[in-house]
């Protein structure tokens, strides 16, 4: 059974362990260095001040996480955000990422977010298919925009309308932990 809950800064060590192989072995993330546990803890706290940061647990072990972040740092973008998901390597395609995204989207809809974006390195076809399954469509490709492991990488931007925009938009509501209760699957 998978339990999805709001992350805490104390989860940082487990999340760094999940993230580390993506940093060291892939161009899925453009970070060159694995963040420290303290840095990752800070990122969790910073995200939770405005957006959801969720973890998935199976048998008490954290096996994945997903979070939303600011799309751009201008007020007009308050109703749009970037979403990210990571699942422990070796157990992808088990429904963990899907469960995390379902909960993430539920939380973001309550916040009045209208548009979701996902930034995906070209060649990460598994992520493209995953996002398309959730209704995302490719809206842009930035050629040779990131450099990692001795080569240039293209980046795809995918977008999904989470809800129909209103005019004027409903007020954006920052994420409080009370929006999310543990959900079992």
Question: Where are the predicted features?
Answer:
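Glycine-rich phosphate/pyrophosphate-binding loop shared by adenosine-nucleotide-utilizing enzymes
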Residues: 2, 61-65, 153
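A short beta-loop-alpha structural element at the N-terminal edge
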Residues: 3-17
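Acetyl-CoA-dependent GNAT
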Residues: 35-90, 101-102, 161-163
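Conserved acetyl-CoA-binding loop-helix of GNAT-fold acetyltransferases
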Residues: 93-106, 129-133
């Amino acid at each position: 059974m998978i339990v999805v809950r709001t992350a805490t800064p104390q989860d940082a060590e487990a999340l760094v362990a999940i993230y580390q192989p993506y940093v060291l072995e892939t161009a899925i993330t453009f970070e060159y260095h694995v963040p420290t546990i303290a840095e990752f803890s800070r990122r969790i706290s910073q995200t939770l001040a405005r957006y959801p940061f969720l973890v998935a647990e199976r048998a008490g072990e954290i096996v994945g996480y997903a979070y939303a972040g600011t799309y751009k740092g201008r007020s007009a973008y308050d109703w749009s955000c970037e979403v990210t998901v990571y699942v422990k390597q070796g157990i992808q395609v088990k429904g963990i990422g899907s469960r995390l995204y379902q909960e993430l989207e539920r939380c973001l809809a309550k916040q009045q977010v209208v548009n979701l974006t996902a930034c995906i390195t070209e060649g990460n076809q598994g992520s493209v298919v995953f996002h398309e399954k959730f209704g995302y469509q490719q809206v842009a490709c930035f050629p040779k925009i990131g450099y990692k492991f001795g080569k240039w990488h293209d980046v795809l931007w995918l977008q999904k309308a989470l809800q129909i925009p209103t005019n004027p938009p409903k007020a954006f509501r920052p994420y409080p932990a009370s929006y999310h209760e543990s959900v079992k699957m």
